[in-house]
Curated annotation (Swiss-Prot):
Predominant localisation class: host cell
Purpose: Plays an important role in promoting lung pathology in both primary viral infection and secondary bacterial infection. Promotes alteration of mitochondrial morphology, dissipation of mitochondrial membrane potential, and cell death. Alternatively, inhibits the production of interferon in the infected cell at the level of host mitochondrial antiviral signaling MAVS. Its level of expression differs greatly depending on which cell type is infected, in a manner that is independent of the levels of expression of other viral proteins. Monocytic cells are more affected than epithelial cells.
GO BP, sorted A to Z: symbiont-mediated perturbation of host apoptosis; symbiont-mediated suppression of host cytoplasmic pattern recognition receptor signaling pathway via inhibition of MAVS activity
Residues covered by region (Mitochondrial targeting sequence): 65-87
Annotated compartments: Host mitochondrion inner membrane; Host nucleus; Host cytoplasm, Host cytosol
Organism (species): Influenza A virus (strain A/Turkey/Ontario/7732/1966 H5N9)
Entry keywords, A to Z: Apoptosis, Host cytoplasm, Host membrane, Host mitochondrion, Host mitochondrion inner membrane, Host nucleus, Host-virus interaction, Inhibition of host innate immune response by virus, Inhibition of host MAVS by virus, Inhibition of host RLR pathway by virus, Membrane, Modulation of host cell apoptosis by virus, Viral immunoevasion
Further remark: Is not encoded in all strains, and seems to be dispensable for replication.
Pfam hit, one: PB1-F2
UniProt-recorded name of the protein: Protein PB1-F2
The keyword Membrane belongs to this UniProt entry's keyword annotation: yes
Originating gene: PB1
């Protein structure tokens, strides 16, 4: 009897490449620098925790790239509160 094999495939949206490995795991590769378009193209089946983590990382990257005075003030205040509770951590 022939056993069905899981063959690798790649689906490209132009902004996100989704690659399925032989073991069934999917990997995402983001290839666009516009957060709105990235979020529009994210698969609906993605785990909410993974999506939240990716969103937080993306926002941090955008902040480091071009901080505004308000976001910089917020960032400094959060770090100061964290320092006063726990001490500095890198």
């Amino acid at each position: 009897m022939e056993q069905e094999q899981d063959t690798p495939w790649i689906q490209s949206t132009g902004h996100i490449n989704i690659q399925k490995r032989e073991n069934g795991q999917q990997t995402l590769k983001l290839e666009h620098h516009n957060s709105i378009q990235l979020m529009d193209h994210c698969p609906k089946t993605m785990n909410r925790a993974v999506m939240l983590k990716q969103t937080v990382c993306w926002r941090q990257w955008l902040f480091l790239r071009s901080p505004t005075p308000v976001s910089l003030k917020t960032h400094v205040l959060r770090r100061w509160k964290s320092f006063s509770k726990h001490g500095w951590t890198n």
